[in-house]
Structure formats: structure tokens, C-alpha cells
Amino acid sequence: HSALGHRYSLLTRLWPSNPFSRRYLQTRDDREGVRDADWVSGAALVHRREVGERLGGLDPQFFMYCEDVDFCYRARQAGWRTRYLPLVTVRHDIGGSAERVKPAMIRARHQSLWKYYRKHFRRNPVKDAVTYAGIFGRSAWLLLYDRLGGRRVK
């Protein structure tokens, strides 16, 4: 679901209040109470020592992106829960003031998305091909847009 409602997806841009986007983006109305979450940002990830030891920590194959998503997914597969705590606020400023995202970061993000997909979901050749085309087609578009002097892209 999060791929459909991701902050930068076409669906979110055309219909911001759709159920997929609302679930992924968690609008202010959705931030009431402690509850389960699919994943939390690595900047806000706190876990029991036992979880890190059993899972082996963050997977080093992921650079900059998806390491937190992967960790939370593996934790869920092992029987643990990821919880959202509204009383905690974490601010992550790295890259926030940059006018444009560097091409290396665009590539790293999309390579990590593909690695994550391959690690956990690769099963069907048709679905794999469509997913690959979607991830790297988007990457190519963002790199071209950036190269042509587009505004900040993600």
C-alpha cells in the first residue's frame, strides 16, 4: 500500500486524501494514540537490544535508504511489532535545506528500493519486471529532470 500512497506518487499528487496516501503519510488526524506502524524512520528508530542482536542490526547492503524499512520488516517477520509513539517528535534536518538532490542520492534511493524488493518480495517474473521498470523508470525520470535544471526532486 505504501508504494501507492507514497508522498511523491502520482496517486498522492492527483488525490492527496486517498486512503493509501492517508495511511502512509499519517495526516495530523491520524497521529492520535500509540499504534502499530509498518516502519519508522531510522532517525527515530529505537529498539530493544535483543531485537538488534537477533536480527543482526541494520543490513549493510542498504546505503542511506530502506535500511529502516528492512529492519522493521524483518522484526515483524520475527514476531516483534513496530510502534508509533505520538508523544515523541524527531526532527531530521540532513538534506532538508538542499535546493536540489544530488544524482548520486537519487540513484542510491532507487537502488535500495530494488534491493529491498529483491530481498523480500521477488517471486513472480512479471511482477518483478513491472516493479523494476517502475523503480528505475522513476529514477531515470528524476535524473533527467534534475539534469535539465528541475527544482528539488525526491
Mark where each language-model region is.
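Short, conserved glycine- and acidic-residue-centered signature motifs
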Residues: 64-65, 106
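Glycine-centered small-residue hotspots that permit tight backbone geometry or close packing
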Residues: 1, 57, 94-97
